[in-house]
UniProtKB/Swiss-Prot annotation:
Record-given protein name: Wax ester synthase/diacylglycerol acyltransferase 11
Record membrane topology: Single-pass membrane protein
Side Extracellular, residues: 214-486
Gene: WSD11
Function: Bifunctional wax ester synthase/diacylglycerol acyltransferase. Involved in cuticular wax biosynthesis. Required for petals development, probably by mediating the production of fatty acids at the plasma membrane in the petal epidermis acting as lubricants that makes petal elongation smooth in narrow space between the sepals and the anthers inside floral buds.
EC numbers on record: 2.3.1.20, 2.3.1.75
Spans within the Cytoplasmic topological domain: 1-192
Catalytic residues (positions): H144
Length: 486
């Protein structure tokens, strides 16, 4: 009986790393996530520490250390957490000359400091510096092995409350899909849906076959065109620069409604337009008109990580932290290779149309599921090193990482601090450019993570993205595609 209790206790206190978490812990693919939260009020360190003690540290991953004994697989081992050891409050001159630059430099420096393996792999930096966007900052640094971006963002939101209602959790938009006939459909309608279903399956199989072929070619021979955005060898070791811009979510939704598309379609269209503007200017500066003329022949792709585990949801995570109950968690993802169309368009709306066509095709493919299964097979048969080589090869052969994270519909408060914006980013992977779009209330935060040796002007990249949205919005209004609701 005593042995049974001991075994049960060890099962609860120890858990092996998932294959994806092992990948993120490998020396050649050591990734971490940084979430910058800009507060509307001055920072209150004791209030944040008290809040973390009752929320974040109750999550098993945030109260476990990574144990890597020789001869054994890495495991998560529960430990007692002293929150004060994870909260860092640097001395900042309140009259600092350029606070915005100080914030950028501080976050960039965080990419050079490895995580302390003797503690749970997270830390929070509290900066009492007033910038053009916030009165103070909380910067959360999390090792990527703790979870995927969507899960970690949901967990962070579960630690917050609505500013308008301090007892209520944030609400996040959920896109509900409906496919197939209703129960009351007629006979001919059901026959029609049968043919639609068969066509869907055939298209799914064909697209998956093509994507698997392109994925295999990317691993062995196919690489993106050499451009001013493509990473150099060792780019993952270079301290990154993090810059952001805040745009209106209403502008994005205006384009979305006018063109009957999704928010993701619009943001990818904005990205295509922004990258085209940036590359066009670069080629002009380098006086290589031939390169500019051949922009449409450029192969430029993004390796996008797709979470294959159903999100636990903010309510479930909040309940787990409050009651210390269990909840599904972990890294389970696959990759898709998303091509971008690069070139200066006379019609700005063409960027969005092209983006929608590309995304719609990718939605009818099992590329992400295949890539995840292939990675797990390589890990099982050839080991971790071979898996890391595989993933690095895919990323090295593409140009950028891209993500769009859905945030709360309303403004939120983080342990007594109403937030003006949230800006996530990731580093440690061998891309010179990573783009994140984060929605928050009526805003969209564009975050650019750049290797300064490849992209020395990330602020201009941000400006190009902002100007691209303005250009697309102006085209919508000029053509009267959007009707103002009364």
């Amino acid at each position: 009986m005593g042995e049974d209790k001991k075994t049960a206790r060890e099962t609860v206190e120890e858990e092996p790393l998932s294959p994806c978490s092992r990948l993120f812990n490998s020396p050649d693919f050591n990734c971490a996530i940084i979430v910058t939260m800009g507060s509307k009020v001055k920072g209150d360190t004791p209030a944040i520490i008290h809040g973390l003690e009752h929320t974040l540290v109750n999550h098993p991953r945030f109260s476990s250390i990574l144990e890597m004994n020789n001869g054994k697989k890495p495991r998560w081992v529960r430990t007692k957490v002293k929150v004060e050891e994870h909260v860092i409050v640097p001395d900042v001159d309140p009259d600092i000359e350029n606070p915005d630059q100080y914030l950028e430099d501080y976050i960039s420096k965080l990419t050079t400091i490895p995580m302390d393996l003797s503690k749970p792999l997270w830390e929070m930096h509290l900066l009492g510096v007033k910038t053009s966007n916030a009165e103070s900052y909380a910067i959360l640094k999390i090792h990527h092995s703790l979870g995927d971006g969507m899960s970690l963002m949901s967990l962070l939101l579960a630690c917050t409350r609505k500013t308008s209602d301090p007892e209520a959790l944030p609400t996040v938009a959920v896109h509900k899909k409906r496919f197939g006939p209703s129960c009351n459909s007629g006979f001919f309608n059901k026959i029609w849906w049968l043919f639609v279903g068969l066509w869907f399956i055939l298209r799914l199989l064909f697209n998956t076959f093509v994507d698997i072929l392109m994925f295999a070619l990317t691993i062995f021979v196919l690489r993106d065109t050499e451009t001013p955005l493509l990473a150099k060898p060792g780019s993952e070791l270079i301290p990154k620069r993090f810059v952001h811009r805040i745009i209106s979510f209403d502008d994005v939704k205006l384009v979305k409604n006018a063109m009957k598309m999704t928010v993701n379609d619009v943001l990818l269209g904005v990205t295509q337009a922004g990258l085209s503007r940036y590359l066009s200017r670069k080629y002009d500066q380098e006086a290589t008109p031939k390169s500019k003329e051949s922009m449409r022949r450029i192969r430029l792709r993004s390796a996008i990580m797709i979470n294959l585990r159903p999100n636990a949801g903010i309510e479930a995570l909040a309940d787990m932290m409050a009651k210390k109950s269990k909840c599904r968690w972990g890294n389970l993802f696959g990759y898709i290779l998303l091509p971008f169309s690069v070139g200066l368009e006379t019609d700005p709306l063409e960027y969005v149309r092209q983006a929608k066509a590309t995304i719609d095709r990718k939605k009818h493919s099992l590329e992400a599921v295949f890539s995840m299964a292939f990675f797990k097979l390589i890990l099982k048969v050839l080991g971790l090193k071979a898996s890391v080589v595989l993933v690095r090869k895919v990323i090295h052969s593409t140009t950028l990482s891209f993500s769009n994270v859905v945030g709360p519909k309303e403004e939120i408060t983080f342990h007594g601090h109403p937030l003006n914006y949230i800006s996530p980013c990731v580093f440690g992977h061998p891309h010179a450019l990573t783009l994140h779009f984060q929605t928050y209330a009526n805003k969209v935060i564009i975050s650019v993570t750049a290797d300064p040796t490849v992209i020395p002007d990330p602020h201009k990249m941000c400006d190009d993205l902002v100007e691209s949205l303005k250009m697309i919005k102006a085209a919508v209004l000029e053509r009267g595609l959007y009707e103002i609701e009364v």
